């Protein structure tokens, strides 16, 4: 496998992208009000929030059973046709930062044998941000049973 390659990208067919989209799970960890507002915005609509565990919820009752709940929601979204598949692709994304600068990115398949978040291994791909290692086990548990992969779970 190449280090970075195209893959099938699933995009939501959502009519309400405001309900669908949320920021990465490792953001606003000390601001539960952000996540409460995201929950209210999503209501009962399909949402990325239903496919991830915000780190703000890690040490709350919401974390219990999250891995099973998320995997079931992923399966339901797949069965209900929530996504459209863009085969053998990359996805270009832009995010506007609070200071107005634009951060650009590419969603792709990555050979995880060539990735290191610690900065200590001689690999080709490294994390651009620090990783809080004690927050990894819940993400690993979610990925273990998940039929879909996301940049942030």
Question: What residue spans do the PLM features occupy?
Answer:
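N-terminal extension/subdomain marker
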Residues: 1-153
